[in-house]
UniProtKB/Swiss-Prot annotation:
This is Glycerol-3-phosphate acyltransferase. Its EC number is 2.3.1.15. It is found in: Cell inner membrane. It comes from Pseudomonas putida (strain GB-1). It is a peripheral membrane protein. The lineage of its organism: Bacteria, Pseudomonadati, Pseudomonadota, Gammaproteobacteria, Pseudomonadales. Pathway: Phospholipid metabolism; CDP-diacylglycerol biosynthesis; CDP-diacylglycerol from sn-glycerol 3-phosphate: step 1/3. The keyword Cell membrane applies.
Length: 828
């Protein structure tokens, strides 16, 4: 457009039109500060084609008294129609750019200077930045359109000018003298490449300083994936299996790579930081972080894989936000393909999310591309985040680990263990989770709704509620090499080829998942809502006098301070009364006043919701509650008998709640808890016998409330064992037993007013049955029917009668005896 007088006239008109809106400023704008030789021709190099950048450059050159880029210039006999060129060619309308080849102007300049020893040309690299630096910009809207490393199309450039044009900055850099490069006598082609390389490095370094580092690997990595040997083999297999041309199979692999890969952009990270800072302080009362210093210590020199628990969709953003705010590199986050929605998906991808399908089954090409993508992230040292639970917990409990991502990680480490991998568990605790009401609907049988862009606007409906604080605790790291040394001592000497899949992989991956889950539970952040829910849900009427509730909460705090669950577990500040006031301010408890004081209770709307928050910390109280349960039906019990019964039930509690202690550590922990219960007056010790308080005493009420914490879990155990025994040997399959357990639990919840949907959660029964099989209490015959060991009867009656009331045991046995009637009536 600037190569003729007419073009320059049109260009001048466009520049004046542009400056009706744009305002620009420059750094190093004079020939003195640039150290220019005004007797030598000056050229300007812009990194990529942009008419608006050229107009801004021309305006600033005129203002600073520098030679204009749109005017002709001569280098010896060479006449150039304009004094500028672009280092890379023009992108198409889709933003695609071919960076091969050299600018023709640069080719001619090098030739002219080489052929005429007295000539020189000064090339000034010029960078134009639209808007403030991302680090100083506070407007999330402007950050979305701020300069980034991604190649952009014309439409986005237009929006950038309109939104950010009032704060445009031009950076003139020190000139490159072509004469100095030519004097190296490297030949024409190498001199041109040398000049290009100097300018590319310069532009990159300057851009890094201004807008932040290029943390995206997408543009190069995706193309590299299809050339990896394992992916090449998968492409060939796909072409043969589906009878496709090799090019089509390769194109499919490339599409998979683009579907999967994240596209980290510093400006989007800053955008999310600004938006989330508002979010955490507007909807929540901020974030409380514990133990992050250990991550800051191990991050250098390690491949860090963050494995948080999964409670809410905002978990995806929370950890990245915290790490960025604390000077750590935000991770690449595994997200379900269901979140790859219009607008939101692109924003998440540029914030570091990579997307994965729910199942890889039947698609070996996709599997190969995904595995290679993760392997590349690991070997290049990019931090990664994924959720071992798979989906969000709807009950507040830790879900059984899904081991797929762990298996991919383990196999990748066996392929290349040069960079040590460390798993960092991250416990995320909410005083009120955004999706709480949705979870309750799903537990009650409502179908899971597909995610939608419109779900974002539901957040604004929550602004009227108070959501309390968010707690983030970093747990004890798990070094993968050390874990493998314990599980498979000879793993380093084995032949670890790219396709290596050892026989011990599945079992070791399962144990790794269980270890991660235990470490997550060890890092639990106990908050006021958890403790109030625990106390009120243990009462028969979901209500307590305020003074009584205060005593219960003070007791729980005292017990937890005396016997901490783990060094990474955290407790709330304040006493029981402070906890009550905090929960009241969130409108999670109702109250009624009378002449004797205030009664706090859970109304129908909040009663079920509060089971979610109780379940967050159920594992913390499992062992003391179990010990307390033995004294509901027995006034005294020896230490030996207590230990015997706890050891009998512990494997099942540990499997469901991911309790941290190994069986050989159990006796020591039992003694610690018994000592704490004695100190708090809930038990009395007489030599080797423990005695409960008088049934009419306040201490007995407190002991009973503590015991009821674990009652529903023990009831489920008793239901399953009663159904098995009443059905007889080899009469039920595991699936049939699950269905019967769910039906019985639903009936009992009505008969006994157990308003907790997870009481009849099928997955809990399924896992209990699996644990019985693992413990050798159950076995399956050739028809898949369940047989049981004699000790099942001991577990069902000998132990159950010690921890469950006679009324409950009778009710469960009656329902079990009449299960056929129940099945028949349920189908009418």
């Amino acid at each position: 457009m600037t190569r003729s007088p007419l073009h320059r006239l049109i260009f001048g008109g466009l520049r004046r039109l542009l400056y009706l809106w744009v305002r620009s400023e420059t750094i190093n704008q004079s020939s003195m500060t640039l150290n220019l030789d005004r007797s030598r021709p000056v050229f300007y190099a812009l990194p990529s084609p942009s008419l608006t950048d050229l107009a801004v450059l021309d305006h600033e050159c005129t203002k600073a008294g520098l030679p204009r880029p749109v005017l002709p210039v001569a280098v010896g006999p060479l006449q150039e129609p304009a004094a500028f060129f672009y280092l890379t060619p023009d992108p198409d309308w889709l933003g695609r750019q071919d960076k091969s080849g050299a600018p023709p102007t640069l080719e001619r300049l090098v030739a002219a200077v080489s052929q005429h020893a007295e000539e020189d040309a000064q090339i000034i690299p010029v960078s134009v930045f639209w808007g403030q630096t991302p680090a100083s910009e506070s407007s999330p809207w402007k950050l979305l359109f701020a300069d980034s490393w991604a190649v952009t199309g014309r439409l986005r450039r237009l929006l950038t000018v309109l939104i950010l044009g009032r704060k445009t900055r031009v950076q003139f850099s020190a000139p490159i003298h072509l004469r100095e490069l030519v004097q190296h006598n490297k030949g024409h082609a190498r001199t041109v490449r040398m000049a290009q390389r100097l300018m590319r490095v310069h532009f990159r370094n300057l851009k890094t300083a201004v807008i932040g580092p290029d943390i995206s690997h997408r543009r190069n990595l995706v193309k590299g994936l299809v050339h990896a040997p394992l992916v090449r083999q998968a492409i060939a297999d796909e072409a043969q299996r589906e009878n496709l041309p090799l090019a089509k199979a390769e194109a499919q692999a490339l599409r998979y790579g683009n579907e999967i890969a994240s596209d980290y952009t510093y400006t989007v990270i800053r955008f999310l930081e600004v938006v989330l800072s508002w979010f955490w302080n507007k909807i929540y009362d901020g974030i409380k972080v514990n133990h992050i210093e250990q991550v800051q210590g191990i991050a250098p020199g390690h491949e860090v894989i963050y494995v948080p628990c999964h409670r809410s969709h905002i978990d995806y953003l929370l950890l990245s936000y915290l790490l960025f705010r604390n000077g750590l590199t935000p991770p690449h986050v595994a997200a379900g393909i269901n979140l790859n929605m219009p607008v939101v998906g692109n924003l998440l991808r540029r914030g570091g999310a990579f997307f994965m399908r729910r199942t890889f089954k039947g698609n070996p090409l996709y599997t190969a591309v995904f595995n290679e993508y993760l392997h590349t992230l690991y070997t290049k040292g990019f931090p990664v985040e994924y959720f071992v639970e798979g989906g969000r917990s709807r009950t507040g409990r830790m879900l059984q680990p899904r081991t797929g991502m762990l298996a991919i990680t383990l196999r990748s480490f066996l392929r290349s263990s040069r960079t040590p991998i460390v798993f960092v568990p991250v416990y995320i605790g909410y005083e009120r989770v955004l999706e709480g009401r949705t979870y309750l609907g799903e537990l009650r049988g409502a179908s899971k709704k597909k995610e939608s862009v419109l779900d974002i606007f539901k957040v604004f409906g929550a602004l009227k509620q108070r959501f309390g604080q968010v707690y983030v605790n970093f747990g004890e790291p798990i070094r993968l090499a050390g874990f493998l040394d314990q599980q498979q001592p000879g793993w380093r000497e084995q032949d670890h080829g790219p396709q290596y899949r050892p026989d011990w992989l599945n079992a070791t991956t399962t144990r790794l998942g269980e270890t991660v889950a235990r470490h997550l539970n060890e890092a639990a952040a106990i908050n006021p809502v958890n403790l109030v829910a625990l106390a009120l849900l243990s009462t028969s009427r979901l209500a307590l006098d305020e003074r009584a509730l205060t005593r219960v909460l003070d007791l729980y705090l005292a017990l937890l301070r005396q016997v901490p669950y783990s060094p990474h577990t955290t407790l709330p500040d304040g006493d029981g009364q402070a906890l009550i006031e905090h929960v009241r301010s969130m409108n999670l408890v109702a109250e009624q006043k009378d002449a004797l004081g205030r009664i706090l209770f859970l109304d129908e709307g909040n009663a079920v919701l509060m089971t979610y928050y109780r379940n967050n910390v159920l594992h913390i109280f499992a062992l003391p509650a179990l010990l307390a349960s033995f004294f509901l039906s027995s006034s005294r019990m020896s230490r030996e008998l207590l230990g015997q019964y706890v050891h009998a039930l512990y494997p099942y509690l540990q499997a469901e709640l991911f309790l941290r202690w190994a069986p050989e550590q159990l006796d020591e922990v039992i003694d610690q808890w018994l000592a704490a219960l004695v100190e708090q007056g809930l038990l009395r010790q007489e030599n080797d016998v423990y005695v409960r308080p008088a049934p009419s005493s306040r201490q007995f009420v407190l002991l009973t409330l503590l015991a009821r914490t674990i009652t529903q879990t023990l009831q489920r155990f008793y239901m399953a064992t009663s159904l098995l025994i009443n059905s007889g040997q080899n009469s039920l399959s595991a699936e049939a037993l699950e269905d019967l357990c769910v039906m019985m639990a639903q009936r009992l919840s009505i008969l006994h007013g157990l308003n907790a949907p997870e009481f009849f959660d099928k997955t809990l029964f399924r896992h209990f049955i699996q644990t019985l099989l693992q413990q050798g209490v159950l076995h399956t015959d050739t028809q898949g029917k369940l047989g049981y060991h004699d000790k099942l009867g001991e577990l069902a009656e000998g132990v159950a009668k010690r921890v469950l009331s006679a009324e409950l045991r009778l009710s469960i046995r009656q329902v079990a005896l009449h299960r056929d009637d129940g099945l028949e009536s349920s189908t009418i």
